[in-house]
Regions:
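Bacterial signal peptide processing site
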Residues: 20-23
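Short beta-strand elements that form the blades of beta-propeller/WD-repeat-like
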Residues: 72-76, 86, 140-149
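Surface-exposed loop and turn segments in beta-propeller and other repeat-based domains
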Residues: 107-125
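Short, well-ordered alpha-helical segments enriched in acidic and aromatic residues
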Residues: 203-230
């Protein structure tokens, strides 16, 4: 029960899925990492009429309508004709419709994303797709957290989508618990940080302000300043050589070791070599469970915490 409660709490805080109400608030390799979208032709953004009676569904759709800087963002869940019953309750398999403008020009118009596009080979019938109630926005990208869950359980997959100003949609699979099964907020944060940071570093034209914004969100002031000048090549957080976004498919966050404020991350590069890094964590002031990144050290496989069970799996592909 404790594990279930903690998992649901973490997912609710970050993703706000199965319990969401009808609210407004402020995705290469074996499979394609980008979602192929169906795009409706619209000269300007106009709210589409939706005659669906959502009161018959136990989970109400979430929507985001907000303006951040020169971004205008409209993302909503909608009923796309698929539903199922669980006991006496009716669940809708919601899809997403995305309309995003930047500088008054459309970047995504009528961009539709469904559960199969997000989950790929991890698609499971009668799991429901849910989105967070807010986005994180930089000069280059709009970031959206998603969950894909078995209704009324703690069995979930989590993802982060990056809607880029160049029209690309990238996807990274994240997790609500460490590889060893530790459920804590730092796991979400480390996954999300690496997804956002690598996305910013690997933009066609990396934007310094956008990179700094991600660093400031997840790192101490001193470490953020130290990392500002680094690129995707020979980066202390990533390792030697040039890091490619698709390598995040094998990205793993391990548990913090007892008595320490650090965790090991690792990923695999082409050829099978694994790279290990120890991420140093520091508690946020006046919080008990929230951590930010304060440094990074090289690590080895011998330093990994002991495994309780499970087998390592690669994350899904990263473009949609």
């Amino acid at each position: 029960m404790k594990k279930l409660a903690l998992t649901l709490s973490l997912i609710a805080i970050t993703l706000l899925t199965a319990c969401s109400g009808n609210k407004k608030a402020d995705t290469n390799g074996a499979e394609n990492d980008s979602i192929t979208a169906k795009t409706d032709s619209m000269p300007l953004y106009v709210e589409e009429e939706d005659k669906t009676d959502y009161s018959k569904f136990v989970v109400q759709p979430t929507r985001i309508d907000t303006t951040v800087g020169d971004w205008e963002i409209h993302i909503r869940e909608f009923y796309d004709g698929k539903k199922f019953k669980l006991g006496n309750q009716v669940f809708a398999n919601y899809s997403l419709k995305v309309n995003i403008f930047k500088g008054g020009k459309p970047v995504f118009k009528g961009h539709k994303i469904d559960a199969k596009a997000v989950a790929g080979s991890n698609y499971i019938k009668d799991f429901i797709l849910g989105m967070s109630e807010n986005v994180f926005v930089t000069e280059t990208t709009v970031y959206l957290n998603l969950s894909y869950c078995e209704p009324e359980t703690d069995y979930c997959q989590t993802y982060i989508l990056a809607f880029c100003a160049n029209g690309q949609v990238r996807k990274a699979q994240t997790a609500s618990e460490s590889y060893e099964g530790d459920m804590d907020g730092y796991v979400f944060d480390v996954y999300d940080f690496y997804a956002m940071y690598v996305n910013e570093l690997t933009q066609p034209q990396p934007n310094k302000a956008a990179i700094q914004k991600v660093l400031n969100k997840y790192c101490t002031k001193g470490f953020a300043q130290k990392m500002q000048s680094h690129t995707s090549n020979n980066n202390p957080l990533l390792g030697s050589g040039k890091f490619e976004f698709q390598w995040l498919r094998s990205f793993i966050v391990h548990s913090k070791e007892a008595g320490t404020n650090s965790c090991i991350i690792h990923y695999q590069i082409p050829g099978g070599k694994k790279v290990y890094k120890r991420v140093l964590l520091q508690k946020k002031p006046r919080t008990e469970y929230d951590f930010i990144i304060s440094g990074v050290l090289d690590a080895t496989e011998d330093e990994l915490p002991s495994m309780s069970d499970g087998e390592e799996e690669d994350a899904e592909d990263d473009e949609m």
